[in-house]
Amino acid sequence: MKQAVFITGAAAGIGRAVALEFAHQGWFVGAADLDEVGLASLKSEIGAERCFTTALNVADAKQWDKALASFWKASGERLDVLVNNAGILSAGAFHEIPLMRHQAIIDINVSGVMAGCHTAYPYLCKTPKSTVINMASASAMFGQPGLASYSSSKFAVRGLTEALDCEWAEQGIRVKSIWPLFVQTNMVVGLDKLPSVKSLGIKLNVDDVARAVWYAANDRGETSPIHYPVGLQTKVLNLAIKLSPAWMSRWINQRMSSEH
C-alpha cells in the first residue's frame, strides 16, 4: 500500500516543496492550508488521484479532527508521516510589535503543532514506523533579537519534539524537527534589514529544506538524531553553540544581530 504524508502550510513555500518531494517519491500526499487556490494548484500538479487537499487553520483543534479523519479515509487508512510546517513570523523590536501579533505567532507556531501532534496520535499509532516532522528553525538554537516571539515559538517546538520522541518511542513513533536558517520564501520578504539577515544572508531555498524533510522522515536508525540543521551555515552555528561557553554563545548571537 502506498505510504502517506500529511503536510500543513502546503499551498506555497517550504510546504509545497515538501509535498512535491514526497509525491515525486511515489507517496500519497495530504496537503492542508488556508490558501485554497494554492492547494488547488498543487493538487493539479501532483494529480487528483495522488493528492488530498483540505482547508485548515492549524490552531483550531476541531478543524484538525475533521481534516485528519477525511485524510485517513482518502489515504487508505495510513499516516506514515505528519509534517507540521505551517508557521508565521513578524520581525522587529519586541516592544514595537503589537501583543496580539506575538500571541498569533504562538497560536500558529506552537498551539498548531501541539494540536497536530495530539490529533494525529491515534492515526500514527495505527501506522507502523510512523514519523512526525516538526518545522523548527535555527532560531531554536539561541533566542534571536528581532525575532523574539518567533524564536520563542521554535524553542517550544524543539522542546515538544524532544519530549514526544521519548514519550512515543514505545509506540514506534519517531518525532523530529528541521532547523533551517533563512529560506527564500515569502516569509522572509522585508527581512533584508534585519541585522542577522545582513550578517548571514539567505542561502537556502525550499528544495534544500524539502530534501532535509525527506531524509529525516526516512532516517529511522536507532542512532538517528532528533534535530536536523539544514545547510552548512546552520550546522556550523549549531556546533559552535554546542561547544562554546554560554558567554561566547551570547557574544556570537550579539555579533550576528548587531547593526555594526
Predicted feature residues:
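Residue(s) in the substrate-gating loop at a strand-loop-helix junction
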Residues: 137
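Active-site helix of classical SDR
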Residues: 117, 153
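The beta1-alpha1 cofactor-binding region of Rossmann-like NAD(H)/NADP(H)-dependent oxidoreductases
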Residues: 36-37, 55-66, 99
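Canonical Rossmann dinucleotide-binding motif of NAD(H)/NADP(H)-dependent dehydrogenases/reductases
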Residues: 1-28
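Conserved glycine-rich Rossmann-like NAD(P)H-binding loop of the short-chain dehydrogenase/reductase
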Residues: 25-41
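Substrate-binding pocket helix/loop in short-chain dehydrogenase/reductase
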Residues: 93-94, 98-106
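C-terminal helical subdomain
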Residues: 177, 197-235
